[in-house]
């Protein structure tokens, strides 16, 4: 590290908050390009900050990333925050490392509920935001309205007068310009760099005292083991330096820091020493937990532990015990699933895992929401795991003898014509309309508060009701007494296969009148597997294996052609929302199958009589 990184007044630590798709990652790409942090020969991948495959595919940021930019002789550390409340555990820890936030808002959509969640945390910590109104060159931009909405949002979140007096800058991440007026259409990002340097305070840290820092996130690498990441709060750290680690319970142990790495661009560079205010990664201490304090052995003082939101949704993971178990995956045993879940717990703080005592093949996994858990399942199946997972359920807690359940704030953006059916559907699921604002261009925005269990399984239904044109965003709001009534249950029954084999077109053709199929000709099925949605509300056991009875009278080939409706192929999220309480989702690297918990019909009957 050069001398200028030691001058604490030249250091700025900021976090970026943005709603999905408002252009956060693209903006950071531009900042890296224009500051010259990427050297000429480095090929810059689009959306550099989304490093995980799933993040790129879904366009969401799950883990917070760090990147450092050198501009003139300032060093700016930018930390990316996950925009989604399901990853709330990440958000709070990230904000503890920075001195200000850039709130990125789309110039036509305005602030959204997911940004609200992170902004609320930032304001509560006393950070003063800089508002960046992005995509200013969109034809549908309405910066004045967006600014008013942002001000109202801050006011609703109890911002102080100083926080309400925020700076605003207009930018286009895609075309790489920024300016203080909303008429800006060319130039570069200099005004944004200048604003950050002028308005953000250098870190309030003590460069002289004995070393102390807190671990705010973890990474894992099979070569060096656990890597801790955090901001140095006091003093400096060198490679191979002895430290004392204090965990959140106050237990102490001694260790040594092996490597110290600073961030430069998107790379981690090994450095000899790092100073107060720097965001660093280090190796050599294992085990390590989030919220651990590292300090100089001569001055052992713990920092207050970081709080993490409690999980709100739970589901069961179990060994895949279907007839097709082990055909497609590499990891199929309880031990392998347990090791993988334990490894996930290292860096996924908002996750909780317990092995069931009555059935050690099953694990109860709890997280911040459906998305949080489905991302874990998707990652595991890509790594070669096979397992059965149950329907997500909300976690009911008891406070002073009253049962409470989680509620979510939902924002829905639909065309006027679909408004009625969406409001009706939300009503049947226990939703209460809080606010409604038409945009005057044929769309309307609806805000609801709804029990989380009413939202499970709603997204698929919502997309059908709005013919794919609706947008829906939800964020955990609060716990409140349980609302009477059952919501979110599937209305239709299912079609269940009665044997093992390959499905035949002739049989499927005759079953099409009974409902919509999940399987096509030649798909492998087994007894107890769900192969379609029944058009009525009861389950029906059917035979998809029955071929056509042939006689020797016919001319061959004249009546072979049967017209099959293409089967429904569900994504992981859709399947999790679809399954009922007596069903499991069989997840393997190649397929997602719905099945009954009891595969044989007489077992199901016995269980239903209970």
Language model regions located:
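Signal for well-folded cores of large energy- and translation-related assemblies
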Residues: 16, 32-36, 53, 70, ...
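Amphipathic helical hotspot of TIR/SEFIR-family domains
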Residues: 110-126, 147
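Canonical P-loop GTPase G-domain recognition
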Residues: 128, 138-198
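Accessory interaction regions appended to the cores of large information-processing enzymes
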Residues: 167, 187, 194-198, 202, ...
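A contiguous, basic/glycine-rich beta-loop/short-helix subdomain that forms a polymer-engagement track
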Residues: 213, 220-225
